[in-house]
Amino acid sequence: MEHFDVAIIGLGPAGSALARKLAGKMQVIALDKKHQHGTEGFSKPCGGLLAPDAQRSFIRDGLTLPVDVIANPQIFSVKTVDVAASLTRNYQRSYININRHAFDLWMKSLIPASVEVYHDSLCRKIWREDDKWHVIFRADGWEQHITARYLVGADGANSMVRRHLYPDHQIRKYVAIQQWFAEKHPVPFYSCIFDNAITDCYSWSISKDGYFIFGGAYPMKDGQTRFTTLKEKMSAFQFQFGKAVKSEKCTVLFPSRWQDFVCGKDNAFLIGEAAGFISASSLEGISYALDSAEILRSVLLKQPEKLNTAYRRATRKLRLKLFGKIVKSRCLTAPALRKWIMRSGVAHIPQLKDYPTRFTSPTSRM
């Protein structure tokens, strides 16, 4: 039975970043259910926007995005829609439009060969015995059993590691549903949609590489019905759909209290969405995945006396920031307050009536 210093379950942005940062410094094994290349197998349903905080993480690490990860077009504002109030406002945002699956595979490709990575693998069982973490997983057609001094759960909303560590912990969850359509809008856009009759979270759309993606986070019980109802409502706001090219769904966490952020125990650690590190106001999680990976890297390499306590303390600033997002979310999803903010026109950028209806080159209008 092979033994490692660190076993990482999940290679989304959080797990991939941590594996890369620990390579050559600790003996690391990493398991991921995505394939190493291509579009077969699991891919994360996601709008695919890289927030400024995530961009800062790449600056800190000296990384630049390859062109095949970046999607077209790049959009500089979010169209915010309040369905019940029939209000639309435009707010400036500095997101980078990316292909999320290509981004995830690129992040994995940065992991050095010194890390033992198993792609297209399935973690079957974990338990702690004799001060070691035992992991049974299936990869390459057969079942394997390894042990590790430290276990890291970077396995997202349905984290097996979190459920093992905190079997009684309950956190609010939604089903995120997305559909892809051929783009029909003359000017591509990114939108954020609020309709409290549909969901007390929010919905979104994004134009990406010739497609129009429409999605949202809805109650688990009847999410599909609510999603369909909202699509019908959006025709009044000039949203154009047609026949769906692809449909996706997954579970998404929605932290609503301080206790929803869980960091781990017994030499097991949680990073990214597995720890509840996701913004309640935007459902953006990549930046917090990268930040929590950097924090855990520092703790593991410094080896303080009580690692779990040190990690919990080190993430306090991050958790406070995310708690602020919970407060912001409550403001945004409160109909009266949201309506007042949007009607005030604060930070709204009106669009000119005669702006070009299609992307054209300067010479085409001469």
UniProtKB/Swiss-Prot annotation:
SUPFAM superfamilies: FAD/NAD(P)-binding domain (SSF51905)
Pfam families (alphabetical): FAD_binding_3
InterPro entries with a match to the protein in the record: FAD-bd, FAD/NAD-bd_sf, Geranylgeranyl_reductase
Alphabetized GO MF terms: FAD binding
The family this protein is said to belong to: Belongs to the CbrA family.
Name of the featured protein: Protein CbrA
Organism encoding this protein: Escherichia coli O6:H1 (strain CFT073 / ATCC 700928 / UPEC)
Originating gene: cbrA
